[in-house]
Design a protein with these regions (language model features):
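Beta-strand-rich domains and repeat architectures in extracellular enzymes and scaffolds
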Residues: 31-63, 77-89, 237-241
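Beta-rich, blade/repeat-based domains predominating
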Residues: 38-49, 81-92, 121-135, 164-178, ...
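Conserved beta-strand positions in repeat-built beta-propeller and related beta-rich domains
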Residues: 53-58, 95-102, 135-141, 182-186, ...
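Hydrophobic, well-structured mid-protein blocks that either form specific transmembrane helices
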Residues: 105-163
C-alpha cells in the first residue's frame, strides 16, 4: 500500500511538473483492446508485419516475444538472469534489445529469434526506436542518443524540451515519420515530440483510463509501450491485462 501511495503521489507531482500551461493535452479515445500477458513487465513494443514484438524487463524475467494479436506466442528468447531488459526495435534482419544498467545492447536475429551479438551503450538503456538511419535511445534523461549502426557510436544527441525546459524520464519510444511518441516514466502521459528539434508538441493524457484500470487491477504498473500498426496506435503498460488501440 505504501508503495502504491508513493507511486500515485509521484505520478501526480511528476505529471504536474512536466506539463506546461501552454502545451496541449489530448485525451485519446480507446477504440479496441486485445489481451496482454499480465506477467510481462513491458519495456518495448512494436509491430513486425501483423505480429507484435514485445521486450520485457526484471532480473531473471527479461525476454523478447513475438505474438499474434490474439495473444498466441510464436517465438521467444530469454536473457540471462543478470540482465534487466529494456526497449527494443527491429532494423533489417536484426532486433536491437537494450539492457538497463549493464551498458549492453543485444543483437537478436529477427526471425526466428537467436542471439547474434552484443555492443556497448554509454549510459543506461531505457527506450529504443529507429530514425534517419540511426538508433534513437532514451536513458531516463531529457536527451535522446543517436547511435550509428556502423560501429554503434553516438553520432548525435537530441534534447527534448517543453517551453525551453528539459523533459526528463523519457522511456519507451515510437517514431512515425518525423514525430516521436515517448512514454514519460511514472506518469500517465505520452509526449508527442517534433524531430529533429526535440520540441514537445502536445501530451497524450491517459490518466483517467489508467485510474479506471487500477481500480480493477491494483497490481498493474505504469503506462509503457507504444506501437504503430501503420494506421493506429496501440498502447499498454507494465503488467497490464490489455493492449489498447487508441485514436487521437
Amino acid at each position: 500500500m505504501i508503495s502504491l501511495l508513493r507511486r500515485t503521489l509521484f505520478c501526480a507531482v511528476a505529471g504536474a511538473a512536466l506539463v506546461f500551461a501552454d502545451t496541449p493535452r489530448v485525451v485519446p479515445a480507446i477504440v479496441d483492446s486485445i489481451p496482454h500477458e499480465q506477467t510481462h513487465f513491458t519495456q518495448g513494443l512494436f509491430f513486425d508485419g501483423k505480429d507484435l514484438i514485445e521486450s520485457t524487463g526484471q532480473y531473471g524475467e527479461s525476454g523478447i516475444y513475438r505474438r499474434t494479436m490474439d495473444g498466441k506466442i510464436l517465438d521467444s528468447l530469454r536473457l540471462a538472469e543478470r540482465y534487466f531488459g529494456e526497449g527494443s526495435v527491429a532494423v533489417g534482419d536484426d532486433i536491437f534489445y537494450l539492457t538497463w544498467k549493464s551498458h549492453k545492447a543485444f543483437i537478436v536475429n529477427r526471425k526466428p529469434f537467436s542471439m547474434k551479438g552484443v555492443f556497448r551503450i554509454p549510459t543506461e538503456g531505457w527506450g529504443l526506436t529507429y530514425w534517419r538511419d540511426a538508433l534513437l535511445m532514451s536513458n531516463g534523461s531529457h536527451e535522446l542518443l543517436q547511435i550509428g549502426l556502423g560501429g554503434f557510436a553516438v553520432v548525435g544527441v537530441i534534447p527534448v524540451t517543453d517551453g525551453g525546459k528539459p523533459v526528463k524520464q523519457l522511456n519507451e519510444l515510437e517514431v512515425v515519420r518525423d514525430t516521436l511518441y515517448a512514454n514519460l516514466w511514472m506518469t500517465d502521459l505520452i509526449a508527442v515530440v517534433e524531430l529533429p528539434s526535440g520540441r514537445v508538441l502536445k501530451y497524450l493524457d491517459f490518466s483517467a483510463k489508467v485510474a479506471e484500470l487500477r481500480k480493477r487491477n491494483p497490481g498493474m504498473d505504469v503506462l509503457n509501450g507504444i506501437a504503430f500498426d501503420g494506421k493506429d496506435f496501440w498502447i499498454t503498460g507494465k503488467n497490464w491485462p490489455q493492449i489498447y488501440k487508441v485514436r487521437f
